[in-house]
């Protein structure tokens, strides 16, 4: 679930607001976006992936909020970690994202299930 936006890193570009499928964020009047509807967060990480400033921290727990501070997530190196390990933007060459390979895995699993159901 989205936990925080580090205001001194945020560039107020609005990309996180635009990509959020559940409309969790609202534009701030003078600063970073506001976490307006946190309970609607699906923990899809889209906001974190699209944040080039690495200002957003989404905790992997989708059922409850986790109490963290900006200082903690910075010290632990959590900011930008999901983007990096997903091979997003500048990390493409160093950490290639091979999740597209799952398409083949799912297709083969579906074919195997169909064959299994055809047998008497």
Model-derived features: positions:
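Aromatic-flanked redox-active Cys/Sec active sites in thiol-based oxidoreductases
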Residues: 7, 22, 38
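N-terminal pre-triad scaffold of radical SAM enzymes
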Residues: 3-9
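Amphipathic, hydrophobic secondary-structure cores in small proteins
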Residues: 34-35, 41
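Flanking helices and flexible, charged tails adjoining ferredoxin-like Fe-S electron-transfer domains
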Residues: 46-120
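Iron-sulfur cluster-binding cysteine motifs and their immediate structural context
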Residues: 4, 15-32, 46-64
């Amino acid at each position: 679930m989205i936990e925080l936006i580090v205001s001194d890193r945020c560039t107020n570009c609005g990309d996180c607001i635009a990509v959020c499928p559940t409309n969790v964020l609202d534009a701030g009047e003078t600063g970073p976006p506001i976490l307006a509807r946190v309970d609607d967060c699906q923990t899809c990480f889209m906001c974190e992936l699209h944040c080039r400033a690495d200002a957003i921290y989404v905790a992997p727990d989708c059922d409850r909020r986790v109490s963290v501070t900006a200082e903690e997530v910075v010290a632990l190196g959590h900011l930008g970690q999901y983007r990096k390990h997903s091979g997003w933007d500048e990390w493409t060459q160093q950490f290639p994202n091979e999740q597209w390979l799952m398409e083949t895995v799912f297709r083969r699993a579906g074919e195997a299930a169909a064959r299994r159901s055809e047998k008497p």
